[in-house]
Amino acid sequence: NITVSCNDVELVKNTDYTVSYSNNKNVGTATISITGIGDYTGTITKNFNIVARDISDTTIGSIPNQTYTGNSISALPVITYNGATLTKGTDYTLTYSNNVNVGTGTVTITGKGNFKGTTSKTFSISARAMSDTSVANISSQTYTGNVISPLPTITYNNKTLKKDTDYTLSYSDNINAGTATITITGKGNFTGMTSMTFIITQKSAEKLNISEIANQIYTGKKIKPNVVITDTER
């Protein structure tokens, strides 16, 4: 709003003068042109400064929950002011922290151009389902008489997961020949369970140690000496 007066008498807009503006939207120097009409003639100009608005005056929409990916998550907030959506790189820039692992990530919004200052918004990163991972097949194992606990190779997004950091393992039916099961339970950045099986094959008798049989004395009957068979690998 402007006031125009002459000899302490306030002039009337659109009766004594008209007003036009230039460069009066964005941050910088704007110009008002006052042009006389009626009893007045000529044009005078006045400048005024438009300064940046604080970015905290904007409205930042909620960021949907994100799911762990193994990489940095750069969720984009929707930022509006006065009904208009701001443009990243023109009105603001974004930086992120704590945006890889499960927990609360933060995006810091820094004003640019017509906006100044900083504000921030948080978002949640939830664990990835263990069923989304890839579990490599385990080759057949041979019976040993002991518990057999092979370690599976588990990957997600081309990255190998770490036992006891990303998952834990439990085994069942993993002693005797047959089908054994591994249950994989997510931990940390992973949640839920998945399972896989592997085969335990019979051990060849050729690998057993058979004791020497002492000479037997004729009895006139079928002789069945005791034989000691041992598995030296057990």
Question: PLM features: residue spans?
Answer:
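Serine/threonine-rich, repeat-prone extracellular segments and beta-strand-based repeat modules
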Residues: 10-41, 46, 85-121, 160-193, ...
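Solvent-exposed, low-complexity, repeat-rich "mucin-like" stalks and linkers
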Residues: 1-9, 47, 51-84, 122, ...
